[in-house]
Amino acid sequence: MRRMPSRPPSKLSLLTLPLAALAACATGQGSPAPATPSSGSFPGAGAATALPAPASGAFESLEGPLWVAAQSAVLFSDVVEKNGPAAHIYRFDPAARSYAVVPTPETSPTSTNGLAVDPQGRLIATERYNGRLVRIEPDGKLTVLASRWPAADGPALNAPNDVVVRADGNIYFTDSDWGVRTDVAHAPMAVYRVSPAGELSRVLELQKPNGIALSPDGTTLYVGSDTQAKVWRLPLDGGGAAGTPTLLIDGASVPDGFKVPDGICVDDAGNLYVTNNDDAVKAIVVFDPAGHLLGRIAIPFRPSNCTFGGADRRTMYVTTLHTVFELRVPTPGLP
């Protein structure tokens, strides 16, 4: 957020997001790697600087940052409260230092959370309060990709949270119960996959799944559970099916606090940047692909998610409750 394996996949495929789309718009097996003793700052990372506040006033609850290379801009969701003002997807232009609202096809609040782009350049979004995964077509129409499990007449999804798209079009998303509707029956919280053919399948049943990301080669899926303070990894085959999950990071073994893993982004070296959405340790915690702790990047407020952007993909954008921060990092990463 790419064709595999020549280019790494991510939440953004780095393919063109059409202007029309913007205008219309289980427990794991095995043991985690031990954390290293050092838990200080992450070498080469700059200080986090707040983006300017929008003229329209304060944001409500920011999530889902997504760098769009074709627009040289970052998108993010203002999730808002279920009964609050209308939710929006915002676009920030780093060159102009200005914001714009990305129009969506529906006038009702959608409370989008996670954002991604598929190989055709279409915007994919989770809708927390509508309980569904949607796609915004180039002509502005909205296509619902998932809303119930295991069938169209089955229980409703809970509150889809984060999403990532592989280069071959496989979509993976987390479904937690944050802000879930109480007037309908719900499926168990889980991680789901929508195949390129549009088939919905359950990847992993998991308590409070949240952040989700892919390895640079698209062969590993990472999923975090914020209430369990754990991050799992799952192997993916050539068709996109997931294998047995293994526990990669256990917050109990990470020194100096790793209690609320929220969003996940990955750099070109395969290192994981996990936002720790916790007042005690407000930071992005960095791990190598084996789960060893590399350090922390301090963020002034509790971070919710992150994305790599800029022309060299070395500018990280981090969402917090009311503010977006930017900082420079030493290694390019996946949007």
Predicted feature descriptions by range:
Residues 79-80, 128, 176-178, 226, ...:
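Short loop/turn segments immediately following the C-termini of beta-strands
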Residues 234-241, 328-335:
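Short loop/turn segments immediately following beta-strands, especially the blade-tip
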Residues 87-90, 132-134, 189-192, 230-232, ...:
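A short loop-to-beta-strand structural motif that recurs across blades of beta-propeller domains
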Residues 33-49, 175, 183-185, 335:
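Blade/loop signatures of beta-propeller domains
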Residues 74-104:
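Beta-propeller domains
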Residues 57-72, 85-86, 106-127, 132, ...:
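Beta-rich, blade/repeat-based domains predominating
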Residues 37-59, 245-248:
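A short helix->beta-strand "capping" segment at the edge of beta-propeller domains
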